[in-house]
């Protein structure tokens, strides 16, 4: 049996800045963008900054499914699937992805990558919640406070650009 759970909110956060005009992305929100950009940013062959994807699922829905489906008597697995959308020209042949549970709440926000000027309302590298600068809540740790020790990691090598990560 397969059961699919879809995210209730998502965004990606970026620790860098524009190479064109220097505008910082630390407070930029893209919560309404259709694409989640998980990447390491390089400039002139030098690593500049990481991005992170934030995805939230309805924990009650998952918990109710587990408790009502007698999973304990059978083996099961859980996967996170992410699909590549922009082409593979910048994709490394080998890479590793880690998934961590986040320990603080966050707002998806209202921004898109193409917004000019940038939108700052919602989660960003610097803030987990931001309402037009009037009620900012910073992450305990910039880039998101996560629970160390509960992470899952997976290495990929010359595979499909689509990610099917075992998060069991």
For each feature predicted by the language model, list its residue ranges.
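Secreted, disulfide-rich extracellular signaling modules
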Residues: 1-168
């Amino acid at each position: 049996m397969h059961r699919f759970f879809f995210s209730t909110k998502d965004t990606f956060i970026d620790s860098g800045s524009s190479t064109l005009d220097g505008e910082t992305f630390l407070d930029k929100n893209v919560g309404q963008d259709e694409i989640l950009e998980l990447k390491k940013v390089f400039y002139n062959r030098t690593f500049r900054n990481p991005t992170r994807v934030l995805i939230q699922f309805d924990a009650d829905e998952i918990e109710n499914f587990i408790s009502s489906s007698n999973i304990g008597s059978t083996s099961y697995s859980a996967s996170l699937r992410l699909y590549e959308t922009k082409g593979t020209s910048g994709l490394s042949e080998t890479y590793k992805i880690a998934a961590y549970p986040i320990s603080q709440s966050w707002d998806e926000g209202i921004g898109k990558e193409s917004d000019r000027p940038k939108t700052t309302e919602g989660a960003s590298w610097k803030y987990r919640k931001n309402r037009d600068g009037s009620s900012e809540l910073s992450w305990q740790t910039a880039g998101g406070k996560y629970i160390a020790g509960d992470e899952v990691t997976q290495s990929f090598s010359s595979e499909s650009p689509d990610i099917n990560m075992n998060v069991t």
